[in-house]
């Protein structure tokens, strides 16, 4: 490991003299790129509801504009991605044929946002324009190049790094080209956004900020309310520290224009080596500076992505400083296990170093364990931090998305999953391999969806839902969870036809704080509707609803409790692995009014809902079955490759803070 770290440090040092000058911050000033039709007041949607509807979408989508997708031979552009999201077919590569496989979504989404990696927008554009006369650096974008180490190094280096021979000494050539690519992306989103009263589809202008600083994943998807946006996206090559990105987004967008609004959604904390939710504040030494940074983070990042194709980031068993027993459902989609083996040679890794200058310790990717890599414990860590400085920097709502690199926005169906990375996993044999030698190996999955409770399917209504954190994530199915908390919720709400309106009137929805102080224990309305699915792919019934409670004890340890409040965890539901046929009964709808029997009015606490389906076949089991028995890789029989999953939905939390 020491040798690997030395190689990283040497490589960064050698690259240190290859960077260009940083651009003036004026290049990020907000500009109005709205199409003319979007500047007019729009009609109310036909399906408008004061009680709010559940809308499903994908806000983590890569197309051929992303350097890694292009290098794996994906040629689905943003137009194609939006087309796929809303029902059109697209074509994916297989070997030398870049349009060999035709795929179509099983059900159109309500909304989508293409989030191509903003890093190298300009470099890739110039390389394509210059063709054979392009500098040697451009080989990193070549067909079949995959994830080129030269590019990875540039998003790992803790300093600004662009190729001078392509971008010019001042970087202006790449900057101008990046603006061209960005404006084109904005125009595409504008073109697909439905502004009629039908409200059939909503698109968001978006991009990804892809920090892999010092070898830890610190990526964020940046989502704008409309097409009044910075003139150029703020990428890792422009803002090496995430708090610099937050500052620029606030100064240039939120404060810089009456019409610009933005939020960012971090993802893949599971492979961040504990850095995503670390409560150190490099450069902010006083409590006042730390408070300011925590407030800025919550303004820019009100939501976290808990699930995508690189696994689940909810929780993990066996972590230091986490008490409360084993949660078997935390073993779900642990992408990082294979990553640990690939990087360190073993799935068993040490705890992450968390001492001084821990954010300067280089990694080669996910290579250590830390509770600060997982959402559940970040929620509890936020309670502790609020007690210390008066601000909770981790008071976020919960979402999910796909992170497809095929342009397949919302392509989450397990039954016919075509992969996520072009020629990196173009065949069934690739997708069921459990090895780091295959880019799209079976530790990956289709990913999830974000659900938003909103009055209508418009940018403003959906964005407002994200701002107030009335959002939820699913591992793919369109489960509809509702979660309310209050001091006087009626106990018969589940049987009341006016359940939702009364819950809003007498409580708060997911994403909010329990109001005021009460000597009584809080009551929660916990409800979910199963995904009915489609005629071709029927949905699975629900098995159970669980409330997860988090708090910290007097020793500073994280405490957790998982309570099944509806359904039956022992209902006997299973799957015939010879055919993937589900067996056993479940529930189309579950509901309960639950009161916390262990409530302590002096103790900060956080609650969220997890709705769990009956077991079903994972995509890897389906694809092993579809291969002739004599052609199945040995991995099809490996215990390391999961055959069954329990799909699920997670609500945003509800918080309690003592007065």
Whereabouts are the PLM-identified features?
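Sec-dependent signal peptide recognition
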Residues: 2-9
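Cap/lid and interdomain-hinge subdomains that line or gate substrate/regulatory clefts
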Residues: 173-181, 197, 237-265
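The substrate-binding groove and active-site-proximal loops of carbohydrate-active enzymes
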Residues: 67-72, 165-179, 228-240, 364-373
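Low-complexity, serine/threonine/proline-enriched polar segments
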Residues: 140-167
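Long, charge-dense tracts
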Residues: 223-225
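C-terminal functional module detector
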Residues: 19-78, 82, 89-141, 174, ...
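C-terminal motif of bacterial Sec signal peptides marking the signal peptidase cleavage site
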Residues: 15-17
